């Protein structure tokens, strides 16, 4: 019940009532690979180790996303393949879903591309980015930015958001 994304929205006395305060960390690829293999077993689909790792690497460090991607890859394997998930069907499926090799989706790349192409890499304000990409500022800040910052594609400065050298290299 006390799981709140923005703890600062709670008063100090209310925060103090929660006995344990936890901070969730992203999972590393090897742990996620094990989760993907286990979930494949639950879904009764066979998966190669390299395919499980590929799903893990593109899942943004999050088991929920890894499982969602696995289900979509399984669907591709059932329709386009023979029901078995190998590295080729995994890459085809994830490419069709617009999930690139670094786990960025279409909106992640659109945000970075907009900052680079329209605003010369920044700095640019959150509301300006939101208007330019057609997404709510809160969604960008809470859904997309944390991963982009964690992975080193984006940085937040007092003057606004800036694309990093990694973002330029990633988008070519």
Please annotate each region the language model reported.
Residues 9-15, 21-89, 97-104:
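Conserved C-terminal "switch" segment of AAA+ ATPases
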Residues 115-172:
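Terminal-proximal interaction/regulatory segments of ATP-powered molecular machines
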Residues 75-123, 127, 131-134:
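Conserved alpha/beta core segments of nucleic-acid transaction machinery
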């Amino acid at each position: 019940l006390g799981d709140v994304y923005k703890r600062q929205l709670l008063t100090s006395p209310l925060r103090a009532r929660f006995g344990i305060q936890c901070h969730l960390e992203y999972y590393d690829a090897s742990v996620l690979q094990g989760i993907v293999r286990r979930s494949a077993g639950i879904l009764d689909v066979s998966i190669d180790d390299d395919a499980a790792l590929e799903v893990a690497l593109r899942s943004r460090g999050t088991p929920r996303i890894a499982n969602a991607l696995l289900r979509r890859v399984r669907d591709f394997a059932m329709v386009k393949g023979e029901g078995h998930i190998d590295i080729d069907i995994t890459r085809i499926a994830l490419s069709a879903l617009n999930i690139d090799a670094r786990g960025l989706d279409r909106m992640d790349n659109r945000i970075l591309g907009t900052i680079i192409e329209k605003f010369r890499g920044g700095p640019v304000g959150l509301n300006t980015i939101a208007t330019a990409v057609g997404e709510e500022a809160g969604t960008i800040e809470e859904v997309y930015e944390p991963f982009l910052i964690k992975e080193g594609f984006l940085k937040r400065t007092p003057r606004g958001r800036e694309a990093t050298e990694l973002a330029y290299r990633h988008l070519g």
